[in-house]
């Protein structure tokens, strides 16, 4: 398969598979041994991390430009589908979900979101599944946010709205009418 030339520009948003969306801030040369190596310097603002990727390793690393809005819409649409079969034990499925998240591929992220989303506000989801779901959703939302010029939290909410994912139930919220009717005082016996 012929190698495709990836052309990146300073200021461009890019996706590094294991980190998500970052901004290419500059290119620089570093001397390693007796060789000069040209590097792409990528800043991941949210995680406060800077990554340097050697130019000759860009393709192998999986670094890519942002996906198109059309491909992102296709990924989100695929997340609306029916959850995949759960024939494997959880440990293997979790490892597969982790691999999909770290791929940085919007379609694979959508698979994780689709398979692990809650179907109703009262569904209970194990902590490890919820954590994987949140990571996949955040990675999708990072790219969605840049494509649609919004912040990541708003993008997460928008994706969940599109997918029809029920909002979390606030167990601390009390209906004002109920609050007035309830008497929690210790009356010392009735």
Model-derived regions: residue spans:
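A positional/architectural concept
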Residues: 1-61
């Amino acid at each position: 398969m012929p190698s495709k030339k990836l052309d990146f520009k300073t200021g461009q948003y890019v996706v590094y598979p294991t980190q998500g969306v970052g901004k290419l801030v500059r290119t620089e040369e570093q001397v390693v041994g007796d060789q000069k190596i040209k590097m792409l310097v990528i800043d991941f603002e949210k995680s406060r991390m800077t990554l340097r990727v050697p130019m000759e390793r860009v393709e192998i690393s999986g670094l890519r430009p942002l996906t198109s809005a059309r491909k992102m819409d296709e990924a989100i649409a695929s997340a609306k589908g029916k959850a995949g079969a759960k024939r494997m034990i959880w440990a293997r499925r979790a490892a597969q979900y982790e691999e999909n998240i770290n791929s940085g591929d919007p379609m694979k992220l959508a698979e994780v979101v689709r398979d692990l989303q809650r179907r109703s506000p009262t569904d209970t989801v194990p902590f490890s599944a919820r954590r994987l779901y949140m990571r996949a959703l955040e990675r999708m939302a990072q790219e969605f946010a840049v494509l649609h010029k919004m912040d990541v939290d708003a993008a997460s909410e928008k994706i969940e709205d599109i997918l029809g994912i029920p909002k979390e139930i606030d167990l601390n919220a009390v209906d004002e009418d109920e609050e007035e009717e309830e008497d929690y005082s210790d009356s010392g016996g009735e």
